[in-house]
Structure formats: structure tokens, C-alpha cells
């Protein structure tokens, strides 16, 4: 009887320990941790589930998941650009997810058609110009920037970065390879200087008068406009009379080898909620994917815009063609 009593006490202690054990999830992410920390802290407060972040380069993180196989700690892979998410799905990193909440909160064109990954913020890429040189009446479309009237006025970020590859991919989907190549060749003919390594330097070149126009992700402009010296930078929403502004995403999917799929789905659903979407928009100055959430007040002043509703998975499937086209057009 004494042995049974001791055994029951031990089992009770184990049971209590298990009840008090904190559930955990691990995100492998190429996003900056400070963008996510306020959201995952709120998630922990609401659910009691702790979220660990492992940050790094997207390609290296995908390779790590491949190498780790079924032993991977990753429950969620999160990154920027639909092209990279498409690559991850193509490498069989993600599992399919069934969720009415994600279905409701995220527009169909901002997620994988097979529900392997989901957009969590929108990134609009459009025209920015120097108000010292031009007015918004001077602009219309991305394609118009190939016109010789802009010779010596255009600055661009390199095509070696995924953002411009995705923009080119969206144009290939709309116009085909040959017509898009004509446009990109026109851009190159109109360059004022060599291409830049990032959007911020291209914007600074426009502000300083080194060139007059560029194409960038809007959150880079929003960050620069915190400094009054860049007040001469103005935004123009491209292609409002046809397909709309090119949008890309940051997003995430559940890793196939995850042992915590239920909680991982719960976290993705939370990231698509109004609370998280508003926090995310405040932190990164990107646009929410949830219609009822509001962007940062500094970018609300730019007004509403029509966006291209191509399914963003095509930005991945057409990426190889975009790279080839850039090479053929001389876009470094």
C-alpha cells in the first residue's frame, strides 16, 4: 500500500510539472527581430505560448531547414518577398494549412494557392520623384519611365536583389517577355548613374539631384521622411489607370517537420488578426493584409491606391525568367 501511495505521489508530481511546462514555438526568420518582438510578446500574454526567434539570411535558413530535416527546431519559416516563399514551397519546406481564419483574413492573391504560405504584410513598390524637378502630373506608369524623355533622370536599385526581380516578374505576367524586355532596356538607357545596392541610396540620389526619379518600396521612403532634409521626395502611385501598383509581401508558412503544428497555426492566425496587423504596421511601415487594419499614420497621408492583384506566387514561378530578362537587357 505504501509503494502504491509513493507511486501515485510521483505521478502527481510529473502531471503537475507537465501542466506548468511552457509551450514553445520557434520561428526561423529573415526579418529583423525587433519588428516581431512586440507581437510575439502579445501572443505569449494571450496564449501562454513562448515564441523563440532564430534570425538569419533567408537562403541560409532554408538550407539549414533542409539539412536538419525531421530534427529541425523550426515550426515556422518567415521571410520577405513572395519569390522567396515560393522557393521554400518548391523545396518542400512547408506543409499545407487548413484555417478558416487565414482564409477570411488574407486575400487570396496574397497567399499560396495551395495554402502553404501566407502574406502577413504588403510591400508596395512604386515611383518616387524629386519635387524640385517634377510634379505628379508628369508621371503615369512604370513602363513610361522607358520613354527617352526621361534620359539621364532615372535611378534604380540593382536587379540582383529580389524586389526588382519580382517587379519584372509581374510585368512578364502582364505583358510577356519581349515587351517587358523593351521596357527594362528603356530604363537602362535612361539611367543617370550606375545602379544602387539598395533603395535608400537610390532615394538619397533623387533628393540630392543626382537623378530625378526612382522605383522603391514605400517603407524606405517613409523612414527617410522622418528626416526633414528629404522633404523634397514625393511619391506617385504607378499604373492607376490599368493594373495598379506592384505589391509584394512578407509572409510565413509552417515547416513540414514541425511537431507543434496546432500552435503554429494559432500563431499564423494571430499574426493575421487586427491586433497583430496594427502592431506590425506600426513597427515596419508596411501595409496590412487585413482590410480592417490601418497602416502607419505617416503613410496614410499618401492616400488609397489600386494595386496589382496578380497572385503573388507568380513572382516566384516567373523569377528565373525575370533574372534572364534583366541579364539580356543589361540591367546589372
PLM region spans:
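Early extracytoplasmic/lumenal segment of secretory-pathway proteins
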Residues: 16-86, 332
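Short beta-strand->loop
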Residues: 28-30, 113, 129-131, 137, ...
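A structural signal for short loop-to-beta-strand junctions that line the ligand-binding cleft
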Residues: 72-77, 95-127, 143, 153-156
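Ligand-binding "clamshell"
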Residues: 88-96, 108-115, 224-238
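A bilobed periplasmic-binding-protein/Venus flytrap-type ligand-binding module shared by bacterial periplasmic
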Residues: 126-133, 247-260, 279-282
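Periplasmic-binding protein-like
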Residues: 152-160, 270-293
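Ligand-binding pocket segment of bilobal, Venus flytrap-like solute-binding proteins
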Residues: 159, 163, 170-238
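Extracellular/periplasmic bilobal clamshell ligand-binding domains
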Residues: 297-332
Amino acid at each position: 500500500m505504501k509503494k502504491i501511495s509513493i507511486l501515485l505521489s510521483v505521478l502527481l508530481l510529473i502531471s503537475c510539472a507537465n501542466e506548468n511546462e511552457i509551450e514553445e514555438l520557434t520561428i526561423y526568420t529573415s526579418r529583423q527581430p525587433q519588428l516581431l518582438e512586440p507581437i510575439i510578446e502579445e501572443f505569449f500574454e494571450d496564449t501562454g505560448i513562448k515564441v523563440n526567434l532564430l534570425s538569419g539570411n533567408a537562403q541560409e535558413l532554408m538550407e539549414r531547414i533542409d539539412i536538419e530535416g525531421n530534427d529541425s527546431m523550426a515550426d515556422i519559416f518567415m521571410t520577405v518577398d513572395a519569390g522567396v516563399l515560393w522557393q521554400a514551397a518548391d523545396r518542400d519546406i512547408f506543409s499545407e494549412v487548413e484555417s478558416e481564419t487565414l482564409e477570411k483574413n488574407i486575400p487570396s492573391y496574397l497567399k499560396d494557392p495551395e495554402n502553404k504560405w501566407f502574406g502577413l504584410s504588403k510591400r508596395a513598390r512604386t515611383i518616387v520623384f524629386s519635387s524640385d524637378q517634377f510634379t505628379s502630373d508628369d508621371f503615369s506608369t512604370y513602363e513610361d519611365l522607358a520613354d527617352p524623355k526621361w534620359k539621364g533622370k532615372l535611378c534604380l536599385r540593382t536587379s540582383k536583389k529580389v524586389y526588382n526581380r519580382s517587379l519584372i516578374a509581374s510585368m512578364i505576367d502582364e505583358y510577356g517577355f519581349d515587351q517587358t524586355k523593351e521596357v527594362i532596356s528603356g530604363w537602362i538607357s535612361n539611367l543617370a548613374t550606375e545602379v544602387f545596392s539598395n533603395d535608400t541610396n537610390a532615394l538619397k540620389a533623387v533628393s540630392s539631384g543626382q537623378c530625378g526619379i526612382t522605383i522603391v518600396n514605400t517603407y524606405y521612403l517613409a523612414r527617410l521622411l522622418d528626416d526633414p532634409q528629404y522633404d523634397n521626395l514625393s511619391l506617385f502611385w504607378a499604373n492607376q489607370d490599368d493594373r495598379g501598383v506592384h505589391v509584394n509581401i512578407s509572409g510565413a508558412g509552417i515547416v513540414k517537420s514541425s511537431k507543434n503544428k496546432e500552435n503554429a497555426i494559432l500563431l499564423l492566425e494571430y499574426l493575421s488578426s487586427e491586433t497583430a496587423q496594427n502592431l506590425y504596421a506600426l513597427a515596419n511601415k508596411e501595409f496590412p493584409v487585413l482590410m480592417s487594419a490601418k497602416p502607419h499614420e505617416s503613410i496614410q497621408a499618401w492616400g488609397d491606391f489600386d494595386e496589382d492583384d496578380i497572385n503573388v506566387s507568380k513572382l516566384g514561378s516567373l523569377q528565373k525568367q525575370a533574372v534572364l530578362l534583366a541579364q539580356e537587357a543589361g540591367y546589372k
